Amino acid sequence: MSAPLHRGLRHVALRVTNLARSRTFYEQLLGMRVVWEPDPDNVYFSSGSDNFALHQIPASELTAFQPLQGQLLDHVGVILESPEAVDRMYQEVEPRLSELGGRIVKPPKQHRDGSYSFYFSDPDGNAIQALYEPTISKLEWVKGKT
């Protein structure tokens, strides 16, 4: 195969236990913008060329809901333009995380491939990596274009 059959991974959807709490977390902490709210149990965000969805776990499933012991989703990530931008984001989000239901999972760290990142979690424990990666971070993103 010479070319991929797709235009890139641009959509991630997470099931959440409290949609209002999770929506506040992603709007206030990450500045995500709501682009579609088809009903009270689903909300879709975008930061330009991506699509991130939160889906409320139905009330009928919520009482019996048990997160997987060994979570299958390792993490989702946001790309930053420099190691300094990673540090700035860490300084901005760290003091606000607990009030919004999240926590720092791993503090900023230099990786052997030249990347630099930290991890934090949302109110449901989903890990988010704030990442500078030398190759990916150099790519130019055009807002609203894919």
Predicted regions and their residues:
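Short beta->alpha transition motifs characteristic of CBS
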Residues: H111-R112, L131-S137
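Short, flexible turn/loop "capping" segments at secondary-structure junctions
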Residues: S2-H6, Q66-Q71
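N-terminal beta-strand motif that seeds the catalytic metal site of vicinal oxygen chelate
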Residues: M1-A20, V76, P134-T146
